[in-house]
Amino acid sequence: MAAAKDTHEDHDTSTENTDESNHDPQFEPIVSLPEQEIKTLEEDEEELFKMRAKLFRFASENDLPEWKERGTGDVKLLKHKEKGAIRLLMRRDKTLKICANHYITPMMELKPNAGSDRAWVWNTHADFADECPKPELLAIRFLNAENAQKFKTKFEECRKEIEEREKKAGSGKNDHAEKVAEKLEALSVKEETKEDAEEKQ
């Protein structure tokens, strides 16, 4: 037993004498990859509104239709700098996966969610969160009623802006259509006069 103690004492387990300068745990990558620029397709858009919220979609395809959580993250209202189109975009917090992506149209209407002053419900004809666009009934819930009201105010401003822009574009299209119709009438009259002139000769 004494011999076992002696051998244990002789064995030095301390790390004081080891030279740390020889240890260099630096690894070179096997394959070098060039840095890639990541595009979110938000570069050409101006951020009008951004706030944290939780999004739900109404799953009517189930046997028992119910609200299903789609994600928690920042909801944004983005306006395209050239086209002027405004869309609602929401990404999940950690994965940054899109959970809502659709244009705001004049027909959209935010309705209060039953029993809550901090949630809104609305319909969209084409939500692009999944691979293919599909109509959705969405609900969004904010931290408090004040944040929910801020969202509604900005959403309504955007909706009215789109409505006014479409009215202006619509009246411009009508003016253009009338001008084209007048030109067509003038052309047909000229053709008739040419035909009349040929018949007279």
Swiss-Prot record:
The membrane-spanning stretches of this chain are none
Q: Which residues constitute the cross-link Glycyl lysine isopeptide (Lys-Gly) (interchain with G-Cter in SUMO2)?
A: 190
> What are the Phosphothreonine sites (modified residues) in this protein?
13, 18
> Which Gene3D superfamilies does the UniProt record give?
Pleckstrin-homology domain (PH domain)/Phosphotyrosine-binding domain (PTB) (2.30.29.30)
| Modified sites of kind N6-succinyllysine | 150
Provide ranges: composition bias, Basic and acidic residues.
1-26
Which terms are listed as keywords in the entry?
Answer: Acetylation, GTPase activation, Isopeptide bond, Phosphoprotein, Ubl conjugation
Phosphoserine PTM positions:
21, 60, 188
For this protein, the record's CDD domains field holds: RanBD_RanBP1
Positions of disulphide bridges = none
**What InterPro entries does the database record attribute to this sequence?**
PH-like_dom_sf (IPR011993), Ran_bind_dom (IPR000156), RanBP1-like (IPR045255), RanBP1_RanBD (IPR045256)
Q: Which residues carry this modification: N6-acetyllysine?
A: 150, 183
Q: Which residues carry this modification: N-acetylalanine?
A: 2
Q: Where is this region: Disordered?
A: 1-35, 163-201
RanBD1 domain location: 26-164
A GO cellular component entry from the record: nuclear pore
Cross-referenced SMART domains: RanBD
MF terms (GO), sorted A to Z? cadherin binding; GDP-dissociation inhibitor activity; GTPase activator activity; small GTPase binding
Q: Which GO terms describe its biological process?
A: nucleocytoplasmic transport; positive regulation of mitotic centrosome separation; signal transduction
Position of the signal peptide? none
Q: Which domain of life is it from?
A: Eukaryota
Main function: Plays a role in RAN-dependent nucleocytoplasmic transport. Alleviates the TNPO1-dependent inhibition of RAN GTPase activity and mediates the dissociation of RAN from proteins involved in transport into the nucleus. Induces a conformation change in the complex formed by XPO1 and RAN that triggers the release of the nuclear export signal of cargo proteins. Promotes the disassembly of the complex formed by RAN and importin beta. Promotes dissociation of RAN from a complex with KPNA2 and CSE1L. Required for normal mitotic spindle assembly and normal progress through mitosis via its effect on RAN.
Q: What quaternary structure, including any partners, is listed in this protein's UniProt entry?
A: Interacts with RAN (via C-terminus of GTP-bound form) but not with GDP-bound RAN. Identified in a complex composed of RAN, RANGAP1 and RANBP1. Identified in a complex that contains TNPO1, RAN and RANBP1. Identified in a complex that contains CSE1L, KPNA2, RAN and RANBP1. Identified in a complex with nucleotide-free RAN and RCC1.
Which protein family is named in the record?
Belongs to the RANBP1 family.
- For this entry, the protein name equals Ran-specific GTPase-activating protein
Which species is this record about? Homo sapiens
